[in-house]
Design a protein with these regions (language model features):
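Long, low-complexity serine/threonine/glycine- and acidic-rich segments characteristic of extracellular
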Residues: 9-116
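Short, small-residue-biased leader/transition segments that mark boundaries at the very start
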Residues: 1-6
Length: 116
């Protein structure tokens, strides 16, 4: 699996670590960062993963040079003072950089697991 990590969620920093979860966030493994690694810039990373064909949720998170780790959507909602998903002002959805989960179905199709 190859993708991009966006450091902008930190508000100002350089990505130093990217972790990937292939089990819905229960466990995390380090990905390999690719050069160039620049401040406030997209950083490509690689993560070798063999998909066994079972439905799963895959997601990545990054940590910057200040030690700030990207929040899950629930951690972000709590920081904003929301107690449950239904109370979230959906117009704010474009203004956050929470961990983005992606659902991979048995047929290989990929859908947004956060807002779908």
């Amino acid at each position: 699996v190859q993708t991009c990590a966006l450091p902008i969620w930190s508000g100002g920093g350089t990505v130093r670590r990217v972790e990937v979860s292939t089990d819905g966030g229960r466990s995390w493994k380090d990905a390999r960062l690719q050069e160039p690694i620049l401040r406030l810039a997209h950083v490509r990373f690689r993560f070798d993963w063999f998909w066994d064909g079972a439905e799963t949720v895959i997601q990545s998170r990054c940590t910057d040079d200040q030690g700030e780790t990207q929040l899950s959507v629930m951690e972000l909602y709590k920081a904003w003072g929301y107690t449950e998903y239904k109370s979230l002002d959906k117009s704010r959805a474009i203004h956050f950089n929470a961990i983005q989960p992606w659902r991979i179905a048995k047929d290989g199709s990929v859908t947004d697991a956060m807002f779908a």
